[in-house]
Regions:
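Divalent metal-dependent catalytic cores for phosphoryl transfer on phosphate-bearing substrates
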Residues: 1, 20-133
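Short, Lys/Arg-rich amphipathic segments at extreme N-termini
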Residues: 1-19
C-alpha cells in the first residue's frame, strides 16, 4: 500500500515518535505503532478514502469534505482498526488526528503530530525545497 518514500517516511516517524514518547513519558510501543501506520492510506485513491470514511459513519463537515488531504488520517484509523484489528483508542486517535490536531489532544496524539513534522525524512524534504518555501 505504500511507496518507497512513504514507507521510509513512516519508519522515520516511528523512530522519532518513539524518541519523543520516551522523552515525554508516553507509551513508546504505541508511539512506534502509530508512527509506522499513520500514513497507511495516504497513497490510496481519494475516492476510496472518502468511501471508507462514509461507510464508517463519520460525517464530514464542510471544511473536511473539501479538504481531501485530511482524509488519510480518518480513513487510516478506520483501516488500522478494521483490517489490522488494532482497537487501541490511543493509537487510532493518534493516527486519525495526526494531520489536523484537535482540542484536548492526548500525549500520544501530540507525539505523532509532532513526529510527523520533525522526522528526518520530512526535514530533508523541506531542506531540498527551501527555495520553494
Amino acid at each position: 500500500r505504500m511507496g518507497d518514500y512513504r514507507f521510509s517516511h513512516s519508519v522515520n516517524v516511528a523512530k522519532e515518535a518513539k524518541k519523543l514518547a520516551k522523552h515525554y513519558g508516553a507509551d513508546e510501543n504505541k508511539a512506534e505503532i502509530a508512527g509506522i501506520l499513520h500514513d497507511i492510506t495516504k497513497e490510496m485513491p481519494k475516492e476510496q478514502q472518502l468511501q471508507i470514511i462514509i461507510d464508517s459513519g463519520i460525517i464530514l463537515d464542510n471544511v473536511q469534505l473539501h479538504a481531501p488531504k485530511l482524509w488519510h488520517g480518518m480513513s487510516g484509523s478506520i483501516v488500522v482498526r478494521d483490517e489490522l484489528g488494532i482497537d487501541d483508542e490511543d493509537i487510532l486517535n493518534a493516527i486519525r488526528y495526526h494531520t489536523t490536531g484537535r482540542a484536548g489532544m492526548s500525549l500520544l496524539e501530540k507525539v505523532i503530530f509532532t513526529a510527523d513534522f520533525t522526522s528526518e525524512a520530512y526535514i530533508q524534504r523541506c531542506g531540498n525545497n527551501e527555495k520553494e518555501i
